[in-house]
Design a protein with these regions (language model features):
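A structural "domain/chain start" motif
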Residues: 41-131, 241-242, 248-316
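N-terminal secretory signal peptides that target proteins for export/translocation
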Residues: 1-19
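Bacterial N-terminal signal peptides
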Residues: 21-37
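Surface-exposed short loop/turn segments
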Residues: 140, 144-224, 228-234
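Flexible, solvent-exposed loop segments that connect beta-strands
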Residues: 98-102, 170-184, 233-253
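Short beta-strand->alpha-helix linker/helix-N-cap micro-motif
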Residues: 123-147
Length: 316
């Protein structure tokens, strides 16, 4: 109901307030986006989740020490042997090293660590059998005086048969620290045969060969290769007022950077599992009494080699 007692000034004030309110409502709607951006009230787009890069490096290069079953007095047998760091060959390339073989470079690094541990344990094993052991040496780096001063050379060589399926693309993945990558998976099998040798040191002629077949194991592996962003073009973005700007657009391209790879870890785990078996077999095969019985045969081979015109490893 209209109040007849309202005075003139009060009526004018109410009229002015109504006009201001009607004008302010659309203005508020116009200003809201800007105010919301400034105050942080606009809904923010959630950042894409970033996956953690799996850690396959833990314990990669550590191998268990071999517990010696017994120990004789060092040097009590009266036989000097050269201890050689274990070597490997690949069935595909028939050569050692990672080049042109089925081992990745990181797998080859794992084997070198394994070989270092095994070389030290084999030397300790020989000493525990009462032998005088020198080494461990790399076979090609043994000097002539060391060869000449030894009765026998002890060598362990591992033949790997490594087979892969074709790696299949799984997905694109955004990783931590703003890294982008492509994830692949596949299967591989690793077969192992260990050969134990006794050599005459100077000629490197084989006195005997014994074998341990460790069979083959199958694995599922996964790796991710990194990608890098690059400027792929530009895109015009309107400012809503008849103008606008050109902004660069970006895309991803592949690189050779490996973000992670489970194969070296799987390889390391298999070597860890095989380690006690091959060391226990070495303890059995490298028998001090048998080696002592071969000393005269080794001397015969050395004399025959020394009288020949071809002297591999001897100074001219």
């Amino acid at each position: 109901m209209r109040n007849e007692n309202e005075t003139g000034p009060l009526k004018k004030f109410k009229k002015a307030s109504l006009i201001i309110f009607v004008a302010a409502v659309p203005l508020a709607f116009l200003l809201f986006p800007s105010l919301a951006v400034l105050t942080g009230c606009m809904p923010q787009q959630a950042a894409a989740p970033q996956a953690q890069i799996p850690d396959f490096n833990s314990g990669l290069y550590s191998f268990p020490k071999f517990e010696l079953p017994a120990a004789k007095k060092p040097g009590s047998v009266g036989l000097t042997v050269l201890s050689i760091v274990p070597e490997y060959k690949d069935t595909r390339s028939e050569t050692g090293g990672a080049a042109n073989s089925s081992m990745t470079k990181d797998m080859a690094k794992v084997f070198r660590s394994f070989a270092g541990s095994a070389g030290e344990d084999i030397e300790a094993l020989l000493v525990a059998k009462g032998l005088t052991a020198k080494g461990p040496f790399v076979l090609d780096e043994v000097t002539f005086p060391d060869k000449k001063g030894a009765d026998l050379t002890v060598l362990m060589q591992i033949i790997f048969d490594i087979q892969y399926s074709d790696a299949k693309f799984l997905r694109d993945e955004a990783f931590e620290n703003n890294q982008q990558g492509k994830v692949y998976s596949g299967t591989m099998s690793i077969g192992m045969k260990v050969y134990y040798y006794l050599l005459e040191p100077l000629s490197e002629e084989k006195m005997w060969i014994k074998k341990l077949d460790l069979g083959s194991q199958d694995y599922n592996y996964e790796f991710a290769k990194g990608q890098e962003s690059y400027v792929s073009g530009q895109q015009f973005v309107s400012d809503g007022c008849g103008g606008g700007h050109n902004y660069p657009t970006y895309a991803w391209r592949d690189t050779n950077k490996m973000l992670y790879d489970s194969r070296p870890k799987l390889f390391s785990d298999q070597l860890k599992d095989a380690y006690p078996k091959l060391m226990k077999t070495a303890w059995t095969y490298f028998d001090a009494d048998e080696m002592l019985s071969l000393r005269d045969k080794a001397k015969e081979i050395r004399d025959r080699w020394g009288s020949s015109s071809y002297r591999r490893g001897a100074p001219q």
